[in-house]
Amino acid sequence: YSQIKGQPRTEEGNFWHKQIYPNQVWLDGIYMAQPFYALYEKHFGDGDFSDTVGQIQTVRAKMFSKDKGLYFHGYDASRSAFWADPETGCSRNFWLRSLGWFAVALADLTEILPDGAGRDKLVPIFTELMASVGRYADPDTGLYWQVPDQGGRADNYLETSGSAMMAYAMLKGARLGLLEKGYAAKGQKTFHGIVEKYLSVTETGLNLGGICLVAGLGPENNRRRDGSYEYYISEPVVENDAKGVAPFVLAYTEVKRLRS
């Protein structure tokens, strides 16, 4: 909590992603900070969630593409990063796992925040994203593409971690009554699609494949991470990385709740 309170902020009031990424907001970082921040305020603070709500609203205002219904991976408030659009400050593409982190953060925050504490401002942002992202799912498997809006490209691939996050968010949203019941079926389809495509049993036990190892934007001395389509599909695809296994387990907990 002391780290959060001392974290540098952009001119709009959002936390920097990291010290080495000054003035930058990444979708990944919303999940890293905001659910914990809100839980701390709920149990140990004064119950003021306005900071969390305000930061989410800024992400919606600055990083949302109305044309695609998706959020760009990063935003540089200073417009000085080599990957940032000089007018909008946003990176140029959408990355599935960053969208997944944001979706999971929203799903969790809508459960954490009580009524009358800004929850009503987050719910429309969550439902809007779930409605728009669903149209990018692969119709056969229910999975989502590494670069979600470019699924027709031969070198793009169906990615596990972000797909599991979307499954979790849709299942949880339906359970909480924020989404129509049909979203539970969509979430189940995605989860079972992951099982069929990427979960295997070997001599060492269960193995989960199709996981993008890592992706980011910069810093200045790493210009390969430029937010291009070619960059996102160039990162290693691995098995059993925690960033894929953990969301898969989270999605499974929601599948189990649905069955109970």
Feature map (PLM): residue ranges:
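Extracytoplasmic mature domains of secreted/periplasmic and thylakoid-lumen proteins
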Residues: 1-32, 43
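Long, well-ordered core segments of solenoidal/helical folds
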Residues: 1-14, 50-83, 123-141, 186-203
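CBM-like carbohydrate-recognition segments
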Residues: 3, 13, 157-158, 162, ...
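Surface-exposed helix-capping loop/turn segments at secondary-structure junctions
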Residues: 11, 65-69, 112-119, 138-144, ...
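Solvent-exposed loop and edge beta-strand segments that line ligand/cofactor-binding
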Residues: 17-30, 83-104, 115-122, 138, ...
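His/Met- and acidic-residue-enriched segments that coordinate or traffic transition-metal cofactors
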Residues: 30-34, 53, 58-63, 67-91, ...
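Charged catalytic carboxylate motif
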Residues: 32, 51, 101, 125-128, ...
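Well-ordered alpha-helical scaffold segments within catalytic/enzyme domains
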Residues: 34-46, 101-118, 164-179, 247-259
